[in-house]
Amino acid sequence: IKLADKQALMGMKKSKHYTLLAHADDSNNRKGFMRNAVGFELSKMIGMTYTPNAKPLELVLNGDYVGLYFLTENIRVDKDRVNIVEQEDEETDSEKITGGWLVEIDNYDTDPHITITEGGDVYTMWVTYKTPGVLSSQQEAYLTQQITMLDKLIYGDKNSDELWQYLDMDA
């Protein structure tokens, strides 16, 4: 949602940008809603550095009930949100491309993104990059390699501790 002027919707901080989070994995909205609600609360309880504010709402559009959604803050790089040092667009120095990423794994093919296909077209994952805005071939290769590796570790050998070498649980 992009507003013309900053507004404080549902008690959240004033902003021009908000997100309507649908529960697309669930035809009756209840399971998806509960998963998202638990995820937001768990994130706050364990002290994650940033958890977007989220307020549940029932969406009615032109008099038709659409469903149950969350209205959330738009996730972006900011000292009060995702506080990272952003990479330069089209960075080619391999020492400078290992951090400063804001990405989103999506169910849809939206630009700007990279596409990761695993297992001979068994599934496709779209990774939308928010920052940097324009990728060099080195940045794209690095991001593809990192996401592919994490995906294999997450869904691979459940008895392996290798995944924990790549996750900073204190961040």
Regions found by a protein language model. Name each.
Residues I1-A171:
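Phosphate/dinucleotide-binding and metal-coordinating scaffold of catalytic cores
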